[in-house]
């Protein structure tokens, strides 16, 4: 009993349990090759090692159900039953009539193996491969003893290690990754490490084999390879073209899946390939896989997913195809280059299959594919793709600008600026205070929403003429932008009635007989959303010439001018100047002297205020217009984008329809309110 407790205490001191001493592999296939190279074999060469030596199978490998790999030989399973034993010697007397079939895997001439020692068969009921032991000495599967005529089913998995008569062999399936038992793996890797240390000592003490000619750019002291690696490199240079021909369809390439995947990815200048492109590259360069219908594609997918040397990368936007693309991991390449520069890559076995292909590519091309350019191009494309629709919209807006009106005054064009709707409140003049959300100071640039400026553009009261106004502001002469119009500013000619636009943007005609605003008079048009004036500033602004307005009315008795500040600088006011809400009962008859009495100090203009309410006194400015905020609301809320007070000019003439309607109401109100008119009507009725 005490011995049972002592044995576990000694095990941690054994080198088998020291994982730090075991070599590591990035490619699973390299690990399998390392394990196979350390499998035990008798001192006397067996017949199977001579008949199925790796040197012979390297050019004659064929499609098979499975393969059984020994230390230096490989047998391919082409039937559902494989016999293992010892064949009869050829020198034996042949006078007997008893004929025995030949053994598939001949482990002779050692007598420890029976003539019919074991068999590997496929169990159709359980759908698995199994080992049946027939010889008296039995066999082992992953170190576990299997006796003769065992009633249990000894199933074989991919990576199982068999031991029969002192000869170890590994059973490997083509469609399943090989999994080695942990206990067997530790033993094999320790042997592998010892073999590599002895081999390195022999190479360093001898003259040295040196690297192939393709590694001249590196130090030969760090490129000592085993003969197997040299033969693999020579095969890569000599058999690539031959293996792609149709007559080589029965020759399996001597490369692992990771090697072929790396070759395919490195063939792309950007180092990026999709899964289908990897399939096509392998099928085009190796006829064996082109004509093979087995699940080698599944093995490719497994290697891509499980191998840390490969990583996914998304496709570019609008790139045809589905799924992700694959590339060699940036961290893996960085680690590889660091090992190259430090000279530590030779301390490992030979590097993984991916590292070997990177070394070959680096030696022949002096650089690795720059896959980071693919991701950079993708990021640039994502950044610029969003700006392309905005540029197209701006170009379309330039092409859709209305033609300029022909008139004696300078041609004033109306640029198509996109004006977002103002958030309305119960008080129509209650603007949300924002500081200069629209920057119109530079007229040469197209309007860009939400571009703020620091200093608002203000009118100078010394400017008297339109030419001086626009030249000083840096705007081309003869062009004035007006994104939003007042109802009184609509003066359409007969030609404009037929081609009436459906959007709220207007292109009014310009008239010559525009009366100038008298000094000392202040019109409510001087207040807009783009400027904020105090009472003293309004007096200074009264000197501005009304000929600089975008649109004027043809009525000689009313001045319906509107400053062009909306097109120049569209900003919310910081201080609201009160405007009077005009109703039929509260007209402008109390303002005959031409001055504007703004009685609405509490900003009582609501959405019920109509544009055609109020009166106009001849000789003074027209103060009967609604607030700009209310007109903005009407413009952007009507379904067809038209003014709700507009009529065809054929009914009321070429004058402003709003003014005609107001003049009509003024006449009616004058007749109703005049005491003389009332007396006349009373006398007529009495008579």
From Swiss-Prot:
Chain positions of motif Nuclear localization signal: 663-670
Family annotation (PROSITE patterns): FHA_DOMAIN (PS50006), FORK_HEAD_1 (PS00657), FORK_HEAD_2 (PS00658), FORK_HEAD_3 (PS50039)
Pfam families: FHA, Forkhead
Highest taxon of the lineage: Eukaryota
Portion annotated as DNA-binding: 252-350
Stretches with biased composition (Low complexity): 389-410, 472-490, 542-563, 589-624
Compositionally biased spans, kind Polar residues: 226-241, 411-442, 491-540, 625-659
Region named Disordered: 1-23, 226-246, 385-449, 472-569, 584-687
Family annotation (InterPro entries): FHA_dom, Fork_head_dom, SMAD_FHA_dom_sf, TF_fork_head_CS_1, TF_fork_head_CS_2, WH-like_DNA-bd_sf, WH_DNA-bd_sf
One Gene Ontology cellular component: nucleus
Every FHA domain range: 82-146
Keywords for this protein: DNA-binding, Nucleus, Transcription, Transcription regulation, Virulence
Outcome of gene disruption: Forms constitutive pseudohyphae. Impairs ability to damage human epithelial or human endothelial cells in vitro.
A GO MF term: DNA binding
One of the GO BP terms on file: filamentous growth of a population of unicellular organisms
Entry function: Transcription factor required for the morphogenesis of true hyphal as well as yeast cells. Contributes to virulence.
Protein name according to UniProt: Fork-head transcriptional regulator 2
Source species of the chain: Candida albicans (strain SC5314 / ATCC MYA-2876) (Yeast)
């Amino acid at each position: 009993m005490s011995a049972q407790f002592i044995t576990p205490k000694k095990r941690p001191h054994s080198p088998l349990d020291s994982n730090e001493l075991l070599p590591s592999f990035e490619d699973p296939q390299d690990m399998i090759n390392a394990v196979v190279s350390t499998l035990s074999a008798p001192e006397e060469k067996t017949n199977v090692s001579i008949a199925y030596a790796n040197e012979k199978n390297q050019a004659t490998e064929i499609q098979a159900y499975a393969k059984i790999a020994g230390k230096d030989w490989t047998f391919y399973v082409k039937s559902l039953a494989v016999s293992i034993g010892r064949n009869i010697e050829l020198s034996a007397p042949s006078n007997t009539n008893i004929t025995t079939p030949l053994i598939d895997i001949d482990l002779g001439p050692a007598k420890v193996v029976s003539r019919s020692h074991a068999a590997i068969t496929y169990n159709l009921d359980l759908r698995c491969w199994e080992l049946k032991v027939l010889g008296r000495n039995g066999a082992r599967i992953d170190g576990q003893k299997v006796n003769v005529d065992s009633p249990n089913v000894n199933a074989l998995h991919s990576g199982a290690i068999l031991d029969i008569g002192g000869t170890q062999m590994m059973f490997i399936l083509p469609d399943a990754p090989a999994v080695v038992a942990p206990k067997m793996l530790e033993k094999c890797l320790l042997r592998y490490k010892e073999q590599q240390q002895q081999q390195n000592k022999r190479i360093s003490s001898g003259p040295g084999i040196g690297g192939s000619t393709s590694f001249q750019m590196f130090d030969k002291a760090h490129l000592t390879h085993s003969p197997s690696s040299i033969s693999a490199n020579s095969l890569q240079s000599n058999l690539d073209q031959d293996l792609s021909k149709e007559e080589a369809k029965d020759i399996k390439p001597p490369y692992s899946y990771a090697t072929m995947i790396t070759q395919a990815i490195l063939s792309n200048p950007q180092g990026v390939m999709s899964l289908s492109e990897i399939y096509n590259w392998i099928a085009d360069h190796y006829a064996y896989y082109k004509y093979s219908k087995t699940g080698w594609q599944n093995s490719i997918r497994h290697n891509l997913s499980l191998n840390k040397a490969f990583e996914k990368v998304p496709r570019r936007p609008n790139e045809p195809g589905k799924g992700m693309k694959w590339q060699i991991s940036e961290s893996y390449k960085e680690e590889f280059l660091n090992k190259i520069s430090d000279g530590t890559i030779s301390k490992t076995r030979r590097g993984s299959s991916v590292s070997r292909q990177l070394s070959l590519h680096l030696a022949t091309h002096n650089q690795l594919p720059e896959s980071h350019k693919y991701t950079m191009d993708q990021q640039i494309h994502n950044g610029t793709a969003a700006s392309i629709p905005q540029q197209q919209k701006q170009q379309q807006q330039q092409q859709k600008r209305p033609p300029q009106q022909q008139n004696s005054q300078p041609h004033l064009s109306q640029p198509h600026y996109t004006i977002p709707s103002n958030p309305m409140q119960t008080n129509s003049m209650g603007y949300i205070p924002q500081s200069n959300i629209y920057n119109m100071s530079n007229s040469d640039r197209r309007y860009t929403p939400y571009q703020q400026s620091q200093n608002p553009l203000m009118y100078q009261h010394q400017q008297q003429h339109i030419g001086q106004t626009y030249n000083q502001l840096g705007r081309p002469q003869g062009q004035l932008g007006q994104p939003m119009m007042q109802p009184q500013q609509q003066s359409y000619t007969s030609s404009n009635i037929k081609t009436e636009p459906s959007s709220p943007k207007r292109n009014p005609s310009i008239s010559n007989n525009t009366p100038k605003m008298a000094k000392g008079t202040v019109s409510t048009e001087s207040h807009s959303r783009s400027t904020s004036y105090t009472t003293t500033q309004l007096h200074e602004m009264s000197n501005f010439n009304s000929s600089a307005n975008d649109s004027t009315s043809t009525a000689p008795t009313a001045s319906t001018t509107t400053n062009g500040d909306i097109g120049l600088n569209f900003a919310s006011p910081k201080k609201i100047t009160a405007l009077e809400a005009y109703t039929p009962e509260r007209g402008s008859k109390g303002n005959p002297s031409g001055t504007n009495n703004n009685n609405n100090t509490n900003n009582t203009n609501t959405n019920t205020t109509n544009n055609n309410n109020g009166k106009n006194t001849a000789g003074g400015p027209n103060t009967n217009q609604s607030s700009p905020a209310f007109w903005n609301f009407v413009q952007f809320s009507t379904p067809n984008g038209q003014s709700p007070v507009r009529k065809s000019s054929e009914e009321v003439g070429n004058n402003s329809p709003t003014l005609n309607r107001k003049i009509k109401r003024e006449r009616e109100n004058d007749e109703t309110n005049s005491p003389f008119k009332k007396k006349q009507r009373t006398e007529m009725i009495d008579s």
